[in-house]
């Protein structure tokens, strides 16, 4: 009886261990982010690797400044001089970050952008908004117009810095669209990937001690979150918005943008983003399915010469698919569609069909091209042979008929 009980206990423990391991693996792969909204998109493919509440409206806090910076870069030169107005620095509530700047101070657009995007200086945002849009209201109109152009459908901006306003909101997906657009601008990338920048001395401040340090610790070499593959881009925090972070990372052939809106703490926005990054690189890879020029299919062409009748169809472009590592390349089956009639003559490179791969929810398409020329078959020889055969047969028939023809009987004479 004791032996039987022991065996039962061992069996139960064994099953429990297996179940525990299974639950752990599932939890690791089923990513859930501790934030109000989160999103991971691989830029090159457009693959949505993860999303939670990505189309739910949230307050953006200082990630707003991404849009402010890109509008400034598109409407100004970095060397332009801007004068700081009284209104630009007098409308900032206490507790919000400032450079600081001084009334009447003349600064370059470049320095103001570094103050805006590294230290997250709210005074710099107002100064740039007045310079570019004529007023904060005018600049806000520009922001909303630009957001609409980029495809943002659930956003509305009323200021250039994200200082809380109930009518100032966005979504994780809309911020992805804005961030993706901004990261195509080399000047923008240079700024947001910089760890620190010293503002130049000015007419109102002669010292060179205003050091703007990036609030994004992923680009801080002394931070435990430092990652050399991260290219920026922006943090944001208000009481109402929570902790926000948009990050761009390039690694293993991936260009990934992650968005977190409303993380619980300042540190968790980084730790959760790091977990999101690890999830991508631990679970996804680029699979090279085909190289341009690979032979996909061999066909027989109608009305072609014997020498060129057999034709290889080659793929028009490389196909590299982002897919879950659980999916093997050899398991991916293509959908091939050829023209209804493929008849000679055919020119090398002529499109004869299409090929489509569906991998982990994404479609990858390419054309199928003729690898070489196909010559149309001529029928002169065949006709001559046919005529010759016909004449021979006709001659044989005539000869046979002559041989079997009965001689005419002579009439009897009486």
Features from the language model and the residues they span:
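Juxtamembrane/transmembrane-helix boundary motifs in multi-pass membrane proteins
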Residues: 2, 102, 106, 110, ...
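Sec-dependent N-terminal signal peptides of Gram-positive bacterial secreted proteins and lipoproteins
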Residues: 2-27, 384-402
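Generic "edge-of-domain/loop-turn" microfeature
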Residues: 6, 15, 19, 24, ...
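Residues in and immediately flanking transmembrane alpha helices
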Residues: 19-20, 78, 203, 291
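Active-site-adjacent loops and short helices of periplasmic peptidoglycan-processing enzymes
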Residues: 25-186, 190
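Domain-terminus/edge residues, biased toward the C-terminal soluble/receptor-binding domains
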Residues: 152-153, 166-169, 173-414
């Amino acid at each position: 009886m004791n032996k039987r009980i022991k065996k039962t206990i061992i069996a139960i423990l064994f099953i429990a261990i297996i179940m525990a391991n299974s639950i752990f693996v599932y939890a690791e792969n089923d990513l859930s982010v501790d934030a109000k909204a989160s999103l991971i998109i691989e830029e090159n493919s457009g693959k949505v690797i993860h999303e939670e509440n990505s189309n739910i409206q949230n307050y953006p806090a200082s990630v707003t400044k991404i849009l402010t910076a890109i509008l400034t870069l598109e409407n100004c030169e970095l060397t332009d001089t801007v004068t700081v107005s009284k209104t630009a620095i007098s409308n900032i509530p206490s507790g919000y970050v400032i450079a600081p700047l001084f009334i009447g101070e003349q600064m370059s657009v470049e320095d103001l952008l570094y103050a805006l995007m590294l230290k997250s200086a709210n005074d710099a945002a107002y100064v740039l908004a007045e310079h570019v849009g004529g007023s904060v209201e005018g600049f806000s109109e520009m922001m909303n117009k630009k957001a609409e152009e980029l495809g943002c459908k659930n956003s509305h901006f009323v200021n250039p810095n994200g200082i809380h306003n109930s009518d100032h909101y966005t979504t994780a997906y809309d911020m992805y669209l804005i961030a993706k657009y901004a990261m195509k601008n080399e000047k923008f990338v240079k700024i947001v990937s910089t760890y620190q920048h010293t503002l130049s001395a000015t007419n109102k401040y002669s010292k060179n001690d205003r050091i703007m340090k990036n609030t994004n610790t992923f680009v801080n070499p002394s931070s435990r979150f430092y990652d050399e593959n991260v290219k920026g881009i922006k943090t944001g925090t208000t009481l109402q918005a929570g902790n926000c972070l948009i990050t761009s990372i390039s690694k293993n052939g991936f260009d990934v943008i992650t968005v977190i809106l409303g993380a619980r703490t300042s540190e968790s926005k980084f730790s959760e983003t790091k977990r999101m990054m690890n999830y991508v690189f631990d679970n996804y890879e680029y699979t090279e399915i085909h190289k341009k020029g690979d032979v996909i299919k061999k066909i027989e062409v109608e009305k072609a010469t014997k020498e060129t009748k057999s034709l290889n169809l080659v793929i028009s472009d490389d196909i590299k698919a982002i897919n879950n590592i659980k999916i093997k390349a050899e398991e991916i089956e293509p959908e091939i569609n050829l023209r209804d009639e493929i008849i000679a003559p055919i020119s090398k490179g002529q499109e004869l069909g299409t090929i489509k791969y569906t991998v982990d929810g994404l479609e990858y398409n390419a054309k199928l091209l003729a690898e070489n020329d196909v010559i149309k078959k001529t029928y002169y020889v065949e006709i001559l042979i046919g005529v010759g055969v016909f004449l021979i047969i006709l001659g044989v028939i005539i000869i046979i008929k002559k041989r079997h023809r009965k001689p005419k009987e002579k009439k009897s004479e009486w």
